[in-house]
Amino acid sequence: MAAKSRSPKRGTSEKTPLVEKEAPYQPPTKGILSKLPASWVPYAQLIRLEQPHGNYMIYFPHIIGLMYASAIRPTELSVLGHRAAIFAIWTFLMRGAGCAWNDNVDQDFDRKTERCRHRPIARGAISTTQGHVFTLILTLLGFAAIQSLPIECTYVGVGTTVLSAIYPFGKRFTHFAQVILGSTLASTIALSAYSVGLPALSKDYFVPTLCLSATIMLLVVFYDVVYARADTTDDLKSGVKGMAVRFRNHLEGLFAFITLSIAGSLTTLGYLVGMGHWFYLFSVGGLTFGLVSMVALTHWNILPGYSSGRCYAFAILNLLTGFIMEYATKDYVVGV
């Protein structure tokens, strides 16, 4: 967590700043960033190299999409491994591009927010132009990584990139920017499905794909609202909109609504494509239990030995496990 902001200089406005005291930026002294050349550190910080959980968050819908498609149509394990490797590269590059774009667009807001004011563009370590060039390079490399996949993957990838570019502007005009962010990640379900030959947006699979995409979108909204609660005070002062701000007095109700909507979407998906009991046990039941546990931790401090992050990870693991079990038990494990 960054330190507090400095007092205003003489002759400046008498308005109380959002952050009253500010300590100067301190270069990293531990972790992966401390091992890099000093000139590389701002760019590594820009792509959140020291925060890999963001990569996991973006990567998991790709894997869910692969297993969703493979539970419906046979896919060799070697093909799944190849696609998973490609999407790991795509995720790393496009997540970095998204972070760089977001920080460039949000730099004025970041300077007013305690948690964000030492980000490289906000503190002046990287210029606006350098940030845009870096974003473009990462984006081009990302699309180069998926060129061996069916052309539909590129089409969906363009849509994903457009949604990602829109996201930071959404926080200025709507309280539901998290829905844009969630839709960005949800679009990767179709991307992954097309990569293994399932026509995800065709008439036969459009509704099931939509149900799973809605699930991913709602999971991202759930996670992002939990994460954004820490910035609610600063966001109210600086005028940043968001669901954590809009529903700040009704967060438990919002979480409950999201959880029920996810359970309903997954149940509908399972019915439409004929999923078996493993899917309902893990992907529906286990996921729902994980999210309910997270709400309980948030409000009533139930299960004090567990963090809310563990509950969320448990929920995601169950979602994936249900698809894996369906894939395995339907004798789709071919070409081992």
UniProtKB/Swiss-Prot annotation:
Transmembrane residue ranges: 52-72, 74-94, 131-151, 179-199, 206-226, 251-271, 272-292, 314-334
Q: Which gene encodes it?
A: ascA
Tell where it localizes.
Membrane
Any single Gene Ontology cellular-component annotation: mitochondrial inner membrane
Class in the EC hierarchy, top level:
transferase
Keyword Transmembrane helix present in the record's keywords: the answer is: yes
Q: What is this protein called?
A: Prenytransferase ascA
One GO BP annotation here? Answer: ubiquinone biosynthetic process
Organism for this UniProt entry? Acremonium egyptiacum (Oospora egyptiaca)
